[in-house]
Amino acid sequence: MKKQLVGFVKYFIFWLTFFLHAKGLFVAWNSDQSALLSGAEIGGIFWHGLIMDISTACYLLLLPGLVLALRPLLAAAFINRFIKLYTILLLVVTSLLTVADLGLYPHWGTRVNVTIFNYLDDPVALSASLSIVDVLLGLLLCGALVAGFLYFFKKLFPDGIADTKKVSWFYLPLQLFLVATLILPIRGGLDTSPLNLSSVAFSPKMYVNQAATNYMWNFAKSVEKRKRLANPCMYMAEDESQRVFKEFHSRDTLSQRPQLIKLKDGRQPNVILIILESFSNKVIAPLGGLHGVVPYLDSLCTKSTVFTSFYSTGNRSDRGISAILGGYPSLLSTSIMVYPEKSSSLTLLPEYFNRKNYHTSFYYGGDINFYNLKSFVLQGNYKRLVTKADFPSELGRMTKWGVPDGYVFERATQDLKTDQEPFMKTIYTISSHSPFDVPFSRIQGSSHSDRYLNSV
């Protein structure tokens, strides 16, 4: 029994070693870009990407783990043969994708994903990116990876993983428990948000964050996303929709643009952008909402510029943020935030301020890895990020989503005393997100509506 438990751990090390080698190959293959990186950035590619490599390795352990749990019922020879064939098959698949990733990245600028299948039936389009020499070198490298790691596998398990001795029935629930615990590293930990591309992002440089990503994880995720990309908006014929779009695009609906801010002596104004989570005109009295829910906002409306015909671009936070910061309209079935290879082509709002020598910062009291938010804001080149990790841990545990907004605003206000001008500060709130567990109670009641009104 001990041999199988040790073997299970060694099998995890086997796949983790494979992915670390693949990452090293990627960095070496793209030496023209890697040579421009510092030692800390190269090390960060491996360190920050380790959580995704571990997650992917644990995915590959699920099926062998379940088969090993059946050792009291199945012969050791059968289990060892099954795991060996499973390993050979996966080595071929992962090695082919490794080579495809290396060959296509310099041309496409993205890690290998499901779109590669779009070109398998079109060799002419594929040959535009790859030469015959590339293909031959790729096949040679693929064969070397399979042969090298198959040799490594035989060295690790000369007699197989399954114990040839009699195994107690006690082993079955123990092994099943071990397989169940794999869910934790697969998910990426106990944080609110599961593992995503933001979990490994740590640099404003797109290449660095892409290199930290596990290519197999990225490929599997792209397969999952592709299932959700059917167009839900086919309400008219293609030619009619094009005509309507072009007609709308050619209009200038605002004949005279008002000057909202009058600058004094040519000074650049400081800018604070507050993104309010789950807000609505229904709680703001001057916009036709309830009275007395948000008295300070109501007061601001009487002495500010208020847009009374302003409509949401979407119904999810990630789609709102991509519209506010990236000027990108909402996609009904997905969000551009989860496609870094696409969002990297956007020029985000803070980048315009950076060009004017502003000091830019982003404040968010929650887990910034949630829904790929970190990767997105890093693309905007914010000079400073303040997140849940920058607050005492007890504050981060006060609510489900993280640090209550009050403490985040206190931190932002405190930073104003030392911020160099001009500055552009973005504050994204979380307390008004379900389940609305704010640390005070101004509006009584336990219904969903009461808790929401209390949170805003």
Short names for language-model regions:
Residues 245-456:
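Solvent-exposed soluble domains appended to multi-pass membrane proteins
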Residues 121-130, 157-161, 238-243, 337-342, ...:
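Short, highly charged low-complexity linear segments
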Residues 135-141, 239-249, 377:
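Long, well-ordered, tryptophan-enriched scaffold segments
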Residues 2-230:
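Transmembrane and membrane-interface helices of multi-pass
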Residues 201, 205-260, 267, 302:
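The feature marks either
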Residues 78-82, 230-240, 337-341:
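Short alpha-helical "patches" and their helix-cap loops
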Residues 18, 113, 123, 213-216, ...:
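Alpha-helix initiation and N-capping motif
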